[in-house]
Amino acid sequence: MTDLDLAALYRLARAASDLGHYNLSKLLNVAAVSVVNRAAWSGSPLTTDRALAEAVAALEPQLRAAQLDQHLLGALQRARETVAAGQLVSYEEAPIIYVCRVCGAVAQTTPPEQCPYCGAGQLVFQLIPATFYLESAAVPIVMAQLARTPNWLEAIFSGLTETQAARRVDGHEGEWSLHEAAGHLLDTQELIALRVQLFLEHESPNLNAKALWQSIESARWSAADIVSKFRLSREAMLIQLRSAPADCWSRSGQHVEFGPVTLQQQCTYFAKHEHWHMAQMRRIRQAL
């Protein structure tokens, strides 16, 4: 399906909604999202910051030709330059941003009471998060998912030797071994445990950014050690969360990349992140 066909699919979804056929609109929107995700999954991944920046730069003339919002185009160019320099794009460089669901107008920081282009009211503006990881799930769901990961992680290594666990398998995410993927999850668990502690101790904690990549230290440990350390850290964190006051979940910390982040968002982020890596680790296990 071409990009033009994809736009036509979204137009059909809009037409169905305008005519009152909301469930048909829903199905058409699902089809469009499925097409996008399938294309992203099957395409050749960009594995370096430089390659990503070059791909964005190559797309910029088409975006300008589409007459997109000038502030958006400027922000994209600055963000691309930041990535090319090997840096993360900060929240200050890319703050809260909204898109009008009616006409596609862009609004930064706060949606206007009335869209200056189509006249739609403020409530039709769609907030675009930095990542779907930050879209909060209900606390009981998040807690249940965080609690299940240690058992899942233990099961994925069941019956494997250390040699098998260390064998790298190429894929959409690049070459990873189960040992490296589990080490990455342990690294991120230590990070979320630290941030949970910060939320419990402070009303508005400073959530210092940290790259979520494989911990060098975990390379020295066996797979069994990684799984054990993950379980101990996760279970201790869950005890803290279960005893936390209800209002603690709505506390908001400050993150250099994401801006304001609540405890609920932070825990949702890491639960979803683990679910994302489950697909990767299942694929690696099947290839061994």
Tell where the protein language model's regions lie, with residue ranges:
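General detector of N-terminal leader/presequence modules that precede the first folded domain
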Residues: 1-42, 150, 154, 234
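Long, charge-rich boundary regions
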Residues: 6, 36, 42, 128-199
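Short cysteine-rich clusters marking metal-coordination/redox-active sites
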Residues: 100-103, 115-118
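A short small-residue
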Residues: 130-133, 211-219
